[in-house]
Amino acid sequence: MCYDEKAEKILPFLFFVVILHTIYLVGLRARFDVARKTTMSDSLSPIQQEKTTTNNPQPNMSYLFSSESVSEGHPDKVCDQISDALLDQFLAYDDKSRCAIESFCTTGQVVIMGEVTSKEYIDLQTITRRTINNIGYTKSEYQFDGNSCGILTAIHEQSGDINMGVDRSKKEGLTEEQRRQAEENQGAGDQGMMFGYASNETENYLPVSLDLSHLLVRTLADIRKEGNEMHYLRPDAKSQVTVEYNDEGEPVRIDTIVVSTQHDDFIKPGVPSISTQDEADRLMLSRIREDVINILIPRVKKQIHSEKVLALFNDDMKILVNPTGKFVIGGPHGDTGLTGRKIIVDTYGGKGAHGGGAFSGKDSSKVDRSAAYMTRYIAKNMVAAGVADEMLVQVAYAIGVAKPVSIYVNTYGRSHVSMKDSEIAAKVSELFDLRPKAIERVLKLRQPMYLETAAYGHMGRKNEIVKKTFSSLYHETKEVEVELFTWEKLDQVDRIREAFGI
């Protein structure tokens, strides 16, 4: 056979091999590209990932999101209220007081600890007992009540090292102008990062799941204090609301409501037709469930003015009431309480972010509190002005330094201005003075305004002016006009719109 004949027979085979090899190489290259993109994505910064997502939109999916709240009788909230009641008392008689007051409570016992620098002395025990009684712990059968609980105090003066770094205006040899400048540049009381968040899904710019959770337990407390219905209620309670969101991230319906409320042992075995404890417990649970559905939830709905939020209630939503079946033992007798353990309830219910610092018991020199309020003020006014539908603002401080070390903004891709988030952050820096002393001045944080914040959330509350009365064994009774929740005001909207050209 000649060479040409051999080649003629081999060529089709070689051509087939070349095609297979080419297919293999194309497949290998595709797998390599996928692996490389995955690796690059993992190494991208959050901002780069945001840009990648924006440039290559992926199909969204609906999801469920939950938030919880607790009542004023929850043991952790008892401690928050004690700490803030004491802080208010110090500020009422000395508005320059520096406080970091922690409280601890358990069966029949309260411990008050922390650091205070103030020229005034207050009666810690009287204020603590009054606060506990006002919450509703007034009966010995609760195993914790304001009249008989033991109270230990371990308050000492604030560290001189911290005070020296924070307040340089007290140094000797300063002129009046130097003293004024030093006071204006008061350093941050600690390092850390603080977050503020706002969303337009409710009228008060909170996540709807958290807003409804607060409303459930607050209304339950109102019913308990009125004493006309649900007479068996005790102070401790929790709620949780799960909301379904659609592909665009909009709330479409309530999926689940959970209510757990402490109650009297109001049905007991031994009465006619009830022979066992299990039967008594079953009847109690049935009664509480009926009352939650027929009394509590209708009262909650009457307080909602947004048709959009009312439309989330539906016939298919699940309502879980006291899922354990019985909740007689509760409050500090059931669980130990501690100041600062409900920071997600206090803020945004798991939306946005949290820097980890608690609020209650701290005066406004502590940026954990004051800067968290300021960033909420910024985020809420920015969303109300139309800059974005949703916004997270972060600031970070170094202890003893007045200006923040960083400012960060995230609009979650829901901005309405032709600016990057980093450019919006730069605008925030121009529009708002974020030094601690300036925050104190703008938000009027040297007022005795804090007890009202210690239950049912620090954010999304009503800004109003009230008169508060303070009395003490060591001072005459004092009436003070106080503006509450100043960080919820929408008084920067016009200024923001002008700055952003909206």
Feature annotation, model-predicted:
Residues 99-103, 108-169:
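Glycine-rich, N-terminal phosphate-binding loop and its surrounding beta-alpha-beta segment
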Residues 41-47, 51, 56-100:
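N-terminal, positively charged regions that mediate nucleic acid binding
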Residues 388-390, 397-502:
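Internal helix-turn-beta structural module
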Residues 70, 74-79, 187-201, 328-352, ...:
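Conserved phosphate/anionic-ligand binding catalytic regions in large, soluble enzymes, centered on
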Residues 4-14:
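Positively charged N-terminal leader segments that act as targeting/secretion signals
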Residues 66, 137, 145-329, 460, ...:
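Glycine-rich, mobile lid/loop segments that gate access to catalytic sites or pores
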Residues 341-343, 348-392, 403-410:
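C-terminal catalytic subdomain
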Residues 3, 19-23, 27, 31, ...:
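Short, positively charged and aromatic/hydrophobic N-terminal segments
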